[in-house]
């Protein structure tokens, strides 16, 4: 500012709770990350398909990373705090103490994780009701949503958990409550995972029909009867106790939270794309699909009017971008699947030794090894006779069938490093083919998508990014800040502080294009063939099932 004092810089803290770690960032008004920290969190798997965490362990990790990113900063310059987290279920008693979600009665483990599939029987019964709320989750509710998990708790842990419970939080809402003492829920969590309607509120008939009439009787006090849009300022901001825990000042604005994938969408989808030669530059923001890819992947598309896509969650009003309807496709395991395939291979120990010797990650080494063995052909052509169906944890979208299994065809007796690298490539391609499958379902229902915006851990893998471009035939935009989910969380804090007039304004000013990866259109014919095989795989799996179940 000429002729006057420059305004002091304003900062925001974004906190992201993922599946295996908590991460935090200090972000400025331009969306630039100034400091970053991460801290692992514990996961328990007491039995198959049961995945649990501890809310106390998660909060402690939030405190560690937040203190780290604000070291050396004038705390008066920190204007807002935003949280995002996985859509896991936190259970507390009436005094806000943890309750066990396990048969062992261990109250420390009071979180049913998002990827937990214990409630298969319950979700099947819910889907048999054909209740009208199901049309807003693609016609079929997922076992990963909260209603089946709540029903499982009532039916299996009545005495030690259900009867004592006072509060059921989505994890993002637990964090904002812990920071402010305000039990209001985020519209994002309730609309996306709990069947809440932004227009009509809770549907009493649904909860009564599935056997959870308890919530209706207490006016939904246990699951949320005050609902705020993401980015809204909560109460009086950070409480003195939470401020001490986090190393911040009391009263700092705290935002109504987002689910982690939605924070990623917020962090990328509104970027200014001018000057990059992208077709979406002259198109509305509804032409963009945000793909948030980490342990699992979520595919976020927005529209001005509601679009109902079979097998794809939504439409959810204002669940990510205010004023827009959101459809959310997804794949239950992506990063986790790649790890599973690579780490389970006989050549994995050799890979570890060679990658360590080169000071590379195992995936950087595999990518360079693929370049070595591809010779004159494009790297993707190495899988001409190896094909993978990636639903090792069921299909979330667009088939919405949790009974589907993974498939690999084209295996040989070879178990060397070349074999591992090609299996890794085929797995990455299968995930990208799954994205194409989801896009085609969304476009058939009325979406018009031209550009992918990728973020999350897998977006740091150049092979993963290029395969998504080649297989979908669409350009892939990567953010200037690779930690887009944390930028999205910081956008929430910025909105809560009042420094921006709207979420849209904060999105536009805090998210920037870093790199664009264009599809290699000369390879289109090959990937069209791979896609035909991909669709045949699931068709054949269903045929095998029918044969084996035939009396």
UniProtKB/Swiss-Prot annotation:
One of its GO terms (molecular function) is D-ribulokinase activity. It catalyses: D-ribulose + ATP = D-ribulose 5-phosphate + ADP + H(+). It comes from the Eukaryota. CDD domains: ASKHA_NBD_FGGY_D-RBK. GO terms for biological process: carbohydrate phosphorylation; neuron cellular homeostasis; pentose metabolic process. Its EC number is 2.7.1.47. GO terms for cellular component: cytoplasm. Pathway: Carbohydrate metabolism; pentose and glucuronate interconversion. Keywords: Amyotrophic lateral sclerosis, Kinase, Neurodegeneration, Transferase. The keyword Kinase applies. Expressed in kidney, lung and small intestine and to a lower extent in liver and detected in cerebrospinal fluid (at protein level). Postulated to function in a metabolite repair mechanism by preventing toxic accumulation of free D-ribulose formed by non-specific phosphatase activities. Alternatively, may play a role in regulating D-ribulose 5-phosphate recycling in the pentose phosphate pathway. Can phosphorylate ribitol with low efficiency. PANTHER family: FGGY CARBOHYDRATE KINASE DOMAIN-CONTAINING PROTEIN (PTHR43435:SF4), RIBULOKINASE (PTHR43435). It is linked to Amyotrophic lateral sclerosis: A neurodegenerative disorder affecting upper motor neurons in the brain and lower motor neurons in the brain stem and spinal cord, resulting in fatal paralysis. Sensory abnormalities are absent. The pathologic hallmarks of the disease include pallor of the corticospinal tract due to loss of motor neurons, presence of ubiquitin-positive inclusions within surviving motor neurons, and deposition of pathologic aggregates. The etiology of amyotrophic lateral sclerosis is likely to be multifactorial, involving both genetic and environmental factors. Belongs to the FGGY kinase family. This is FGGY carbohydrate kinase domain-containing protein. It comes from Homo sapiens. The lineage of its organism: Eukaryota, Metazoa, Chordata, Craniata, Vertebrata.
